[in-house]
Amino acid sequence: MWPVRRCYVHPVSGLQIFGVPGLPEIVEDTDLAASIVAAATEAGLALADGDIVVVTSKIVSKAEGRTIELADVEPSAFAIEWSATWDKDPSVIEVVLREARRIVRQSGPVLITETHHGFVCANSGVDQSSSGAHGRLVLLPTDPDASARRLRADLAALGIDAAVIISDTFGRAWREGQTDIAIGIAGMHPIRSYIGEFDPHGHEFKVQAVCLADELAGAAELVKGNISRVPVGVIRGYAWEIDDTATIAPVLREPSRDLFR
């Protein structure tokens, strides 16, 4: 299911994680690759081959024009009725519903939805924070994998061979607090399988598979943040599995294997 692939081993001793400060305000058609490279270089943190570049989905969406003005939204009858019950903005709820494949759970004012990508999250990933203007919503990228591939290709055109992860902040069903996870990936396989390998005592792993993409997204969040205006993190010194056809699809559990769906 998860084939072993060749690895990119960066010639650095130890693992380094750093944020990229100084990025400009991202607007539609901003050249993200050029902006990231310029900001990193200006900060004395020039990108290098083998880096893993973790980019907050919000700036990807803004660069791709995935924003919507609330004034342009006409709420449906359901959105109006639901919003009146829970004191919510009906235009926001309408956008949440449009971005959803289905409502997974509804409890009080909380909507947990499955997006058209297959992600299960609050409010379809729709967000007002750091949108760039009052009354504007930022949506998830239409195809985060395609976004990651474009950014990886654009970085390669600038002479940098890096893997790219598009991240977003999600809640977790059984734990308090949010964490960043990967919603798009390019250049590296998202999962490291230990199936068929053996532990130090000779026991064979039958099901062990680690979601590296989520772990790396979470690690990069330690140096990123909305308040600090650092939407890009770089991980250096990690040996990653090269896969130019990688997508986030292997991370999404099929309904037939999901005990809680």
List each model region and its residues:
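Phosphate-interacting basic helix/loop segments used at nucleotide- and nucleic-acid interfaces
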Residues: 30-45, 142-162
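N-terminal glycine-/serine-/threonine-rich phosphate-binding loop
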Residues: 10-52
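A structural signal for small-residue-enriched, beta-sheet-centric alpha/beta enzyme cores
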Residues: 13-24, 57, 67-73, 78-139, ...
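Short, conserved active-site loops that position catalytic residues or coordinate cofactors/metal ions
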Residues: 50-51, 55-58, 63
